[in-house]
Curated annotation (Swiss-Prot):
Gene name per UniProt: groEL2
PROSITE patterns, alphabetized: CHAPERONINS_CPN60
Role, per record: Together with its co-chaperonin GroES, plays an essential role in assisting protein folding. The GroEL-GroES system forms a nano-cage that allows encapsulation of the non-native substrate proteins and provides a physical environment optimized to promote and accelerate protein folding.
Keywords annotated in UniProt: ATP-binding, Cell wall, Chaperone, Isomerase, Nucleotide-binding, Secreted
Disulfide links within the chain: none
Organism of this sequence: Mycobacterium avium (strain 104)
Keyword Secreted: yes
Protein name per the record: Chaperonin GroEL 2
């Protein structure tokens, strides 16, 4: 495909036009009085959202240079969303301000590399200041306030705070669509995984279609169980102990399954067989998690243990096990708390070292099952369009609340960034680097000014008033009052604020140091087929 090339100012201005087109669509959503954006979908109903990254993903521009500029800013929003779960609109507004001021200085003759170094040093200083000023999140109310700011709804904030209170900071909180109107919270005690009983004959509660085992032994096997002679010695010992048995194995089939079912129907012995979750190495790891949680051991040839020689001491224990056709829940496993803590620490290390989003997500799920629990928020709404928008807001708010617990909170509403400006005076920079720091100084006011503008206030007046206020005091755009924002519950996770700034600065540096842009040349649409003489081709008169 043929390429088109732009140089110098033409290249940079083309990229900036694309950035502005995207940023102008995104920034109208910033703050409590921000508006929504309607996104047309090729199929189905349109989506209504105020989420920066969702809007950014939908924008495709026609001009090749503008398209590249927009793609670069999409990367800012996506990276911020990946790291912090929120702050995508703030990141876009900061990127726009940094690029605008930066290009103005480049056009005036400043060295782009000097500006880039100055911007990087200034951002590092501001990040350090933000982290120092962050307050730890200690109360349920603080979590609720932070989540409510993200979702724009206090009831959502309260529900997320309750969910985190129940499952712990490491617990998994998932959001599901509900057929009923409103919000509901469902909690899962202990470890739950998505595998149910192998045979319906194991059911103990016909009405609920559940198999419930009280105080059972738990047999964990890494291979298939098919012959009854392998299982019999252990079964006899369990029957003598007078307890039910849960078997979790790669599969239970043939004679072994028949024997268990027949004994269950006759009332001789209560048991349930379940397939182990996952595949390959992940299955082995999850079985090991269950072994540590229940105080048992995985029967595996790899560690020199076989089923026929297994002893009752290798079995795990739990207070209760509930098995449905789709899932199994182990409540209060009898594992050693130190061993569980060690396993949790090991999984945390694996999460930090993993560079795959999918692996990280699966490790996080394992961590939650061991360390906390699982909470499901069920969201309902009057229409499908509203339901999707609400679900998305709740998911963002959950990640926001977790980010707040992780690194602490700072004053929201763009105030923390503006109040970090004096820290730049400590930098002793000269020449173009000093100019780069001044670009950051101007850009740090942009989020507050945009929030004020969206709230119908004069941005310059608001910025001046906040600049002269004590640290942490600023505009509460929801009420129009100037107050201590942390006390008023207007807080942002510092992780969100710093990620937005760092990612915006990264892309701004690329914009400023760009000297040429190579893009695909737009193809001209082919003329419709027809008779070149103007008649109807192929017709005979």
């Amino acid at each position: 495909m043929a390429k088109t090339i732009a140089y110098d100012e033409e290249a940079r201005r083309g990229l900036e036009r694309g950035l502005n087109a995207l940023a102008d669509a995104v920034k109208v959503t910033l703050g409590p009085k921000g508006r929504n954006v309607v996104l047309e979908k090729k199929w189905g109903a349109p989506t209504i959202t105020n989420d920066g990254v969702s809007i950014a993903k939908e924008i495709e521009l026609e001009d090749p240079y503008e398209k590249i500029g927009a793609e670069l800013v999409k990367e800012v929003a996506k990276k911020t969303d990946d790291v912090a779960g929120d702050g995508t609109t703030t990141a876009t507004v900061l990127a726009q301000a940094l690029v605008r001021e930066g290009l103005r200085n480049v056009a005036a003759g400043a060295n782009p590399l000097g500006l880039k170094r100055g911007i990087e040093k200034a951002v590092e200083k501001v990040t350090e200041t933000l982290l120092k000023s962050a307050k730890e999140v200690e109360t349920k109310d603080q979590i609720a306030a932070t989540a409510a700011i993200s979702a724009g709804d206090q009831s959502i904030g309260d529900l997320i705070a309750e969910a985190m209170d129940k499952v712990g900071n490491e617990g998994v909180i998932t959001v599901e669509e509900s057929n009923t109107f409103g919000l509901q919270l469902e909690l899962t005690e202990g470890m739950r995984f998505d595998k149910g009983y192998i045979s319906g004959y194991f059911v103990t509660d016909a009405e609920r279609q559940e198999a419930v085992l009280e105080d059972p032994f738990i047999l964990l096997v890494s291979s298939k169980v098919s012959t009854v002679k392998d299982l019999l010695p252990l079964l006899e010992k369990v029957i003598q102990a007078g307890k039910p048995l849960l078997i979790i194995a790669e599969d239970v089939e043939g004679e072994a399954l028949s024997t268990l079912v027949v004994n269950k129907i006759r009332g001789t012995f209560k048991s349930v067989a379940v397939k182990a979750p996952g595949f390959g190495d992940r299955r082995k790891a999850m079985l090991q998690d269950m072994a540590i949680l229940t105080g048992g051991q995985v029967i595996s040839e790899e560690v020199g243990l076989s089923l026929e020689s297994a002893d009752i001491s290798l079995l795990g224990k739990a207070r209760k096990v509930v098995v449905t056709k789709d899932e199994t829940t182990i409540v209060e496993g009898a594992g050693d708390s130190d061993a569980i803590a060690g396993r949790v620490a090991q999984i945390r290390t694996e999460i930090e070292n993993s560079d795959s989003d999918y692996d990280r997500e699966k490790l996080q799920e394992r961590l939650a099952k061991l360390a906390g629990g699982v909470a499901v928020i069920k969201a309902g709404a009057a229409t499908e369009v509203e339901l999707k928008e609400r679900k998305h807001r709740i998911e963002d708010a959950v990640r926001n609340a977790k980010a707040a617990v992780e690194e602490g909170i700072v004053a929201g509403g763009g105030v923390a960034l503006l109040h970090a400006i004096p820290a730049l005076d400590e930098l002793k920079l000269e020449g173009d680097e000093a100019t780069g720091a001044n670009i950051v100084r101007v850009a740090l006011e942009a989020p507050l000014k945009q929030i004020a503008f969206n709230g119908g206030l004069e941005p310059g007046v608001v910025a001046e008033k906040v600049r002269n206020s004590p640290a942490g005091t600023g505009l509460n755009a929801a009420t129009g009052e100037y107050e201590d924002l942390l006390k008023a519950g207007v807080a942002d996770p510092v992780k969100v604020t710093r990620s937005a700034l760092q990612n915006a600065a990264s892309i701004a540096g690329l914009f400023l140091t760009t000297e040429a842009v190579v893009a695909d040349k737009p193809e001209k649409a082919a003329a419709p087929a027809g008779d070149p003489t103007g008649g109807m081709g192929g017709m005979d008169f």
